């Protein structure tokens, strides 16, 4: 029927036109930009983690932004332009030699967000090129189910999730908590 055709087309349009981009924002404005995007109904993500700051007389838990001056924006072409109208947003991240904004694949974003939500270990962003690690699935601990690469950084085993252009998000991971994924997957 015509109605179901329209519905299908709309569904396809919505599914295919929204992509994850990295908006570069003014220092310390990540959360303000995110709040404004929320009000506009544009999905976004600012990766934060809790850090404990210790002084001699007290300790305080603060939320630190993992990727300063960056906000992930899930937008269609029209929304993508609207975001650039913010005075606090300078531009989108673009790969060297390209003109259109870099897209972070949905699967990478899903893994990254899962890691941030569930990791009990601190997550560090490693922007230096990291040799490809063995593809593994976490089978124990809070990150069970996460697929990533097992890498060694400074002699410690870590699970790494690659993000196009941004490098890898890494967290300490005992080797016994992962199993290799065969080529069958």
Identify the residue ranges that each predicted region occupies.
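Basic nucleic-acid-binding interfaces
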Residues: 13-137, 177-185
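Short beta-strand-centered aromatic/proline hotspots
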Residues: 145-152
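Short, surface-exposed beta-strand-loop junctions and turns on beta-sheet-rich folds
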Residues: 90, 166-169
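A generic beta-sheet turn/junction motif
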Residues: 152-154, 165
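Short, small-residue-biased leader/transition segments that mark boundaries at the very start
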Residues: 1-7
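A short macromolecule-binding patch
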Residues: 160, 168-178
